């Protein structure tokens, strides 16, 4: 027999940003426990609301299946001595099984005969083991800071108030986290029944929705919020900004979602929309509304946790809450504009970037110089890049950014425009932080690009330079900064070398850095970011490793190599040539002497080695234009033509000949062959 199983843990308010993660982990952990216990079932569904985590298991077996456990002992040849008496090994094994040697069965295999112990194990009832399984699943949740409550010694992410475990209509008795299982379930704080009893697992979650006014199905709540918010925005002629992270957080904050629309005074629209949106989304968890031209409208959408008979009062209440925050933004905006950004530059002396690396003013000076250098390399306006670098961090000293930290950069752009700075300079103040996350847009112009790269490189080199390379945590977001630099160079195709960029950035720190290997460490770190990035892009690890083996420090060049090797791998000749390169590498690794640069044609004896020597010579000359222009795909496509002469060489030529001169000449030929491929990648690392 199989029944539906329910477990619900009633808690105090769970952290909204962690609710989905907790619920999914609970389900995954519990399913793993069920499989480990060999309890048949047809799937686990999770439920999550602000004050509960729950699971329902479909068709959970009422008990484990009976099974026969076999334990193999020593081979019969080792189990008995010459007189046929059990050896100590056999006796020890039998004792461990709880039997005597003569009670053991025999197992015959192709490799011989063995002692065997068979034991019939009766399956345990689910009701007797499921409590422990659930407790283990909860104990392994990803909880960074568990807490204790009352006088209990148990710990969980929040205090636990109720526990319900039902197998069909049967109550599973037991205790988890200091709370005994019962049929009592708590409803909504302000609507429905505060507490009620549940008769069977099948009633969940419908009974909770009907009697408790709690929608336990997380995805259903989210779907309602999305659909109703879109309708509400359309009703005022707009489109709701339904950023998924915020939708997830709001879904995790409400038990009974009611979507409402409110408004604010149009005069606030004179303030840059980013500041208003920061207030609405960050502080109040509201959804802004835009028109079809992406212009902010004087409306916002919010999700109430109660179904009020007078929703207008709920709307008015939220409008009253947001109005002072918008007024603050307006005040800061008007006040900040009374002083030009450049006047705030000296104030950066009072803000520490990092104790050993100096103030933000020190960082600004380095960014200014480095941005000018990069601008020169990529053909951007040097003076504008330096000006943007000088102003880059000035908005950190404004009231707006001090109060609304996420507006840094974008407010600098607005203030720079107000001050009459060049448009490229103003835009760069915002775009210096791009790309902010994976998949984000890149800076839109050369000035922005120069400043963005300068800022990131300064941070990376500085932190590595004082020996604080990221290990587990990454407080300075160096991984993201590195990927940002690489993306900019690769996607814009800049012919920039990390060696030069890192060396220039290092030179600007004077004697502040203490790590003598900072340049090498930074480059190795950034090459490691290549591996992660290109794996995410779908390139296999062996292709990436084949290119990294050549340690190319020009990101755009690295990109071309990876794509070329990826194309080469699909060619018919690839597998054979990769194996040949591996073979050549192994042969050369065993040779301890020195090889000539050129082969001696007079020493060529076999037709196959003559053919390969001629092919390598012709190919070397033919590939010069491709190598010079970085056309690696064309080069590898041509190198694929070497498959036949290479295969013929290994089939017909003894490389390690007894004649030393002959052997060295053949090794030189193979070395020249391998070097052709190594100008692009080490294809011997390619897997089948």
Curated annotation (Swiss-Prot):
Catalytic activity annotation: tRNA(Gly) + glycine + ATP = glycyl-tRNA(Gly) + AMP + diphosphate
Enzyme class: ligase
One Pfam match: DALR_1
Highest taxon in the source lineage: Bacteria
EC number: 6.1.1.14
GO biological process, one term: glycyl-tRNA aminoacylation
Locations listed in the record: Cytoplasm
Family: Belongs to the class-II aminoacyl-tRNA synthetase family.
Name of this protein: Glycine--tRNA ligase beta subunit
